[in-house]
Amino acid sequence: MLPRTRLMPSGFIGPCLPSPAERPPSGPGWIHEIKHDGFRMMVRRDASGVRLLTRNGYGWSGRFPLIAAAAHALKIRSCLIDGEAVACDDEGLPVFDRLRYRRDDRRVFLYAFDLVELDGDDLRRERIERRKVLLIRLLAKAPVGLQVNDHIVAPGDVVFRHACQLGYEGIVSKRLGSPYISGRSHAWYD
């Protein structure tokens, strides 16, 4: 059997990956986000259309039509959004098996947590605070399928405890002022 090869899509930017941590960071200088039980997804919208890409660059545009349609409806020329595709139950909690086995694709949403490019501008060197503001503006009137994964400013251990009590997978902590760097980052922890 021949080894499987993969050509990276044109313009593919690998995601920023959190480093594992024993405990979430606390104190000033950190924000925290709920970690949903889903698939990491990069959503690229440009003149050629909408592409949904896994963290390894595989194309999944046909798998989640609600996300693709919502990205297509955005009133912009181009963007690259980083987030997590999540299937939710009736209470809004993630159900990984529904996502994994593609049950009820109408209930798969993208929880967007970063904006890497916008209208041709590369935002990777911008501070996370700036990227978050732009992401919130971009998705303020987005159709169903795209929503911002809100961040929380509070002690990390408190946020983690509450997230677990509510049935979420955990949290991702991000250092304020950090740029977007592909690969493992010590500015993001989970």
Residues of each region from the PLM?
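Catalytic cores of nucleic-acid ligases and guanylyltransferases
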Residues: M1-D190
